[in-house]
Amino acid sequence: MEALHQKIREEGIVLSDQVLKVDAFLNHQIDPALMQLIGDEFARLFADAGVTKIVTIEASGIAPAVMTGLKLGVPVIFARKHQSLTLTENLLTASVYSFTKQTENTVAISPRHLNSSDRVLVIDDFLANGKASQALISIIKQAGATVAGLGIVIEKSFQGGRAELDSQGYRVESLARVKSLEGGVVSFIE
């Protein structure tokens, strides 16, 4: 997606050979016009997938997920990282390790929002080692629902997440596939 590539080149900051900071438009400050384009593109890519729900993890996946849900006309559920007084009943949970935050979290979704008839599209801001995607897939399976595919805003292709999801037979559509961050330069798989 050229608009996303351009935004990454202009406003992304390479912090190391492993870390790309995109807080100027995706995961701190949000560019609504770009999110709309991202939602439109995911909706186009998954128009034939029979999606009934979208699942993401709070917080950075919410903006692209909501825009995709708006375009597809389906609800968006975000897995919560923090306990809530209102989120208590027989939760669907999975453990996820965050590469950038170097922490382990338990994420949870209420079983009231997913059921066995759902075809679920996973939307996330990044795909690196695939731990967040695997956690969401686990929750979807716990509900007896079907994974319709995964929509990733930025994939770090040099890490193993994509290969693992591919080997499990999941459909993965990434809007920007980063080949390398070496030398402080973002290079894409075209």
Swiss-Prot record:
Entry binding sites for xanthine: 20, 27, 156
Source organism, top-level taxon: Bacteria
Q: What keyword terms does UniProt attach to this protein?
A: Cytoplasm, Glycosyltransferase, Purine salvage, Transferase
GO terms for MF: xanthine phosphoribosyltransferase activity
Principal place where this protein is found?
Answer: cytoplasm
PANTHER family attached here?
HYPOXANTHINE/GUANINE PHOSPHORIBOSYLTRANSFERASE, XANTHINE PHOSPHORIBOSYLTRANSFERASE
Name by which UniProt lists this protein: Xanthine phosphoribosyltransferase
Organism, scientific name: Pseudomonas putida (strain ATCC 47054 / DSM 6125 / CFBP 8728 / NCIMB 11950 / KT2440)
